[in-house]
């Protein structure tokens, strides 16, 4: 449809006459330069000038810096003015979209990296919350934990850590929504809620954790392949997986989210299938061993260790493995800057975490204890000469079930790649956060036009080269070191999240602020955060004891200490170094001095109540199945 109305005559930046037409069909603005030889006869330009740039050129241009220059800002401002001149309601529509959408009710008083693209949808967030973390720790590392603790010790360790995790995710969900405009999420909370030095140390240790996880997962992937073949050099597979992870992340947040959606769907389906098959095998419905029941809880036993002290050490050692296995659950906070609707996505993901803890972790761990004896020589960490494999594969293969173990191993491989993908994505965003906080060189804050922190991604890719040790005879030792750094660092990070939440709530109370300003309130509140914080401090103390006096040994072992507790000296060195450099010796920021406005999204309590009431009304008037889904999800 052509525009027959008389055009408005305005001047553009080039001082040339510009015609602007308002079409009736779609109310879009069409404009082009008058007198230009490039003016099309049938289709107007949607912009000052539309270049027929090739796909290759657009791809390379996407790596250029996303920051707007002064001229670009002027042009963008004038474009908005031109839009308002034609349709005065369009500016109002933009304001409504920006300020009154369901995920942005209230005042945006913070700062974020606007160049990061909001391409992560609620469905992505749900699957990231449910499936991320189902990787090396749960699917492979549990073999070592089962050897050290036995089936009962393994279950106790995961149950304790699961109760802690639920409190952590509730606190994390509350602050992630309030600080949804803060790039890096909880990695930045301690700096302005607790103390700068503490925030600096935790931020760098957490970044180091995910830098270690990527090569750890790639090494694990090569170990998983050994179930099928040992004749091919493991580094060949490392190269393939390394290139795959980098390729996925080249597509930015959308590539990461879509890949995780696929990976996590496969993982959850596999865990569901294993749960069903495991029950069938245990009662004698499949396999060659008939009814198994709880036989392995009696022979070789529920706990590993002749003495009570060794059994206790086994449970403590399991806690670190469990922390690593649960690691990544907090990714819902890292991705808030790239979520399209965090107010809907984050509370739902935090609520559904209980299903992940109970079903994906505790239920399957109970089955592992029923199906795999802790003295199996195929478990990682055992002294036997058997080919090492995931305990989930052993649980099926050792009882004579064929074919299925290959499918399980294939999904485990996907799970490991999923964690490698998540760790690569996270470490790059964490470098970006460190740079924006002034904790790392500014070069890491480079974001290209596609929303990728390009320089930070390069550092993550460089660090992942450690994975090429897979062909080394010290492969399992490298695995142990990387796992220890990652697991203990996770405890530091979770402690920082809970401590930040306690300080945040304390500041809200001291400064007389209403909790109605929060878009989502933790179901466990300050008591849940206090419980989690105290428990993690006790776990760190117990782990220190296990590190200097390993299981089964009465003497001190320096090598074992650094293998299990290396992250602690790093944290202390970073904290003390920051304090000495800045000559700042305060332990906490006073509650009345905490800045509760900067970075924070202040929600309108009345609008939130109105929106929630409208949602409940829709549920009451809707079909019954929607009410059921809303209750559980």
Swiss-Prot record:
Listed Pfam families: AA_permease
Gene Ontology cellular component list: plasma membrane
Domain of life: Eukaryota
Stretches in topological domain Cytoplasmic: 1-124, 170-197, 253-260, 335-352, 414-452, 499-531, 579-633
Entry-annotated residues carrying Phosphoserine: 6
InterPro entries: AA-permease/SLC12A_dom, Amino_acid_permease_CS, Amino_acid_permease_fungi, APC_YAT
Skewed-composition ranges (Polar residues): 34-54
Principal localisation: membrane
Assigned keywords, A-Z: Amino-acid transport, Cell membrane, Isopeptide bond, Lipoprotein, Membrane, Palmitate, Phosphoprotein, Transmembrane, Transmembrane helix, Transport, Ubl conjugation
Induction behaviour: Induced by transcription factors DAL81 and STP1, which are activated by a signal initiated by the plasma membrane SPS (SSY1-PTR3-SSY5) amino acid sensor system in response to external amino acid levels.
Location of region: Disordered: 1-54, 87-116
Gene Ontology terms for molecular function: amino acid transmembrane transporter activity
Compositional bias (Basic and acidic residues): 92-101
Extracellular side: 146-148, 219-231, 282-313, 374-392, 474-477, 553-557
Family assignment from sequence similarity: Belongs to the amino acid-polyamine-organocation (APC) superfamily. YAT (TC 2.A.3.10) family.
Function: Broad substrate range permease which transports asparagine and glutamine with intermediate specificity. Also transports Ala, Cys, Gly, Ile, Leu, Met, Phe, Ser, Thr, Tyr and Val. Important for the utilization of amino acids as a nitrogen source.
Name of the protein in question: General amino acid permease AGP1
